[in-house]
Amino acid sequence: MTSTSRAFVTILGLTAIFATAPATAHAVGTPENPWYFESMRTEEIWEHARGEGITVAVLDTGVDSSLPELQGQVLDGVDFTMDGSGAHVDTDGHGTHMATLIAGTGKDGGIRGLAPGAKILPIRIFTGERGFFTAESAETWKEGIQYAVESGADIISLSSGKLDVIGNRGPLKEAVDTAIRAGVLFFASAGNEAEGQNEPHPPASLDGVVGIGAVTPEGERSSYSTYGPQVALAAPGNDVPWHCEGLDGPLCLHERGGTSSATALASASAALIWSQHPDWTKNQVLRVMLNTAERSDDQRRDDYTGYGIVRPDRVIVDGEGDPGDPDSPPIFRDYEARLSPPATPSPSPEPESDPAAGAESGADAEAASPAESSGNGSLPWLVGGGVVLLLVAVTGWTVWRRRA
């Protein structure tokens, strides 16, 4: 397919707390059919599962439900900010974009999400105007996470990779504990600081939270994607669909969508799997995600992409992945056993196919051999067991902008 030259304008920047990097013009796929749709065999997935029956709580800047692709997709939600304008108000755009990547329907030419059958529970916990949080605002995060649990969310998607809670992380940790005990699957951005300090930050660095890194269409860790033991999985973070001139603007491809976008797509992947297997627990959904993740080498895990790149198609289309014991977490076993009351029974030995055993802190754990492809729908950078680069025609102007 011939790529069309496009001139992109600078899009609205986000504050430092968001795991979204500056946007640039870069032609990979199209906004209507991004590259990962083909890689993940999305059309085939949708013949089996679309995310129906799954609620994804998006803790962010709110979700503008007036977008055509989000009409009928967004639940009432709640606004915990001092602004108090409502959960369906998003003056920044970050939360809305995360929601579209998860559950957008594509209506009227809008963004198509990976799990269009899922529902979004918007929980507005910041407006995008602040780069750090005080001990008082940590209580707001706690309230937001607890609201997600009490509202019956199956998945929490938190696209903030650098949460600096000044003075007290206790409330945030307590809220995570509550979510894990309730059987909620919690994803959070690893962050976009690899080119700087590359320090782990909550929430991804907290026990129980599945840290998500970002990858390029070439299957490589995105240059900005924070790495470390907190990274459990990776998902597409570059060249993702975006409204590039504000939420009412035309679609484009956000070249550096960040680990924010990767977290949204990992959450959507989990929603697809869970909708096909509604009787599974969070442990089983996460286990098959880890076991079927795509790797280009024979390592069991590394600090850059964790156990690999999410491949929901391998589970849904090919039937790969053993869900295992519903009560035994594939990672964070010791942490969950220490919870009072415990989230799961005491850890017990798992089969060798289990991806991780006895993870004490973060996602770094002893893992089994990486999942091998069945030969169907391999990602474009994996051919004949080797790593190859996509042939990409890149045209247009590159534009950078950072909000101070």
Please identify what each model-predicted range represents.
Residues E52-T55, G117-K119, E150-I156, R181-F186, ...:
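Loop/turn elements at helix/coil->beta-strand transitions in domains of secreted/extracellular proteins
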Residues S157, H277-W381:
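C-terminal subdomain of the subtilisin-like protease fold in secreted/lumenal serine endopeptidases
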Residues S189-G208, G213-Q230, W242-G257, D298-T305:
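Active-site-adjacent substrate-recognition loops and nearby beta-strands
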Residues T2-I54, P68-E69:
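Protease zymogen maturation seam
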Residues G128-P202, L251-R256, S261:
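Substrate-binding/access-modulating region of protease and related hydrolase catalytic domains
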Residues A99-I102, I125, N238-V310:
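Hydrolase catalytic cores
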Residues W46-V56, V63-D76, G86-A135, E220, ...:
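Subtilisin-like serine protease catalytic core
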Residues P380-A404:
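C-terminal membrane-anchoring or membrane-association module
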